[in-house]
Amino acid sequence: MKRREAREKALQALFQIELNEMSLDQAIKNIMEDEQDDYMEKLVEGVMANKAEIDAIIEPNLDNWRIDRLSKVDLSLLRLSVYEIKYLDDVPNRVSLNESIEIAKIYSDEKSSKFINGVLANIAPEDK
């Protein structure tokens, strides 16, 4: 599975966890069916293990917004991206940023992709 697909599936699992208060294992199983992808699982598990810290990074970068007012898709995507940016050294920030914008265009809308771009641009240093 390519990393883009792993990110999309991780987003879907995180969305299910957020929306339905589903367990991490159940969400991964629902999304992956009989497949397995270590990177996708690493993303979902990493976001959930560091969710409070990730939210604390996101919140101050939301101009005139509160984290609880974000759509579940946008919040899940921001968490996923911040996890990659802050916790994974093998993913350049610009790659994570660009992937997030492209995925937002698929799962959200143009306005959300611009919003996500703005938030992540404040969080992600260009040089990693």
UniProtKB/Swiss-Prot annotation:
Gene3D superfamilies linked: NusB-like (1.10.940.10)
One matching Pfam family: NusB
Gene Ontology molecular function terms on file: RNA binding
Swiss-Prot/TrEMBL keywords: RNA-binding, Transcription, Transcription antitermination, Transcription regulation
SUPFAM superfamilies, per the entry: NusB-like (SSF48013)
A GO cellular component annotation in the UniProt record: cytosol
GO terms under biological process: DNA-templated transcription termination; transcription antitermination
InterPro entries, alphabetized: NusB-like_sf, NusB_fam, NusB_RsmB_TIM44
Sequence similarity: Belongs to the NusB family.
Function: Involved in transcription antitermination. Required for transcription of ribosomal RNA (rRNA) genes. Binds specifically to the boxA antiterminator sequence of the ribosomal RNA (rrn) operons.
HAMAP family in UniProt: NusB (MF_00073)
Classification via NCBIfam families: nusB, PRK00202.1-1
Protein name: Transcription antitermination protein NusB
Organism encoding this protein: Listeria monocytogenes serotype 4a (strain HCC23)
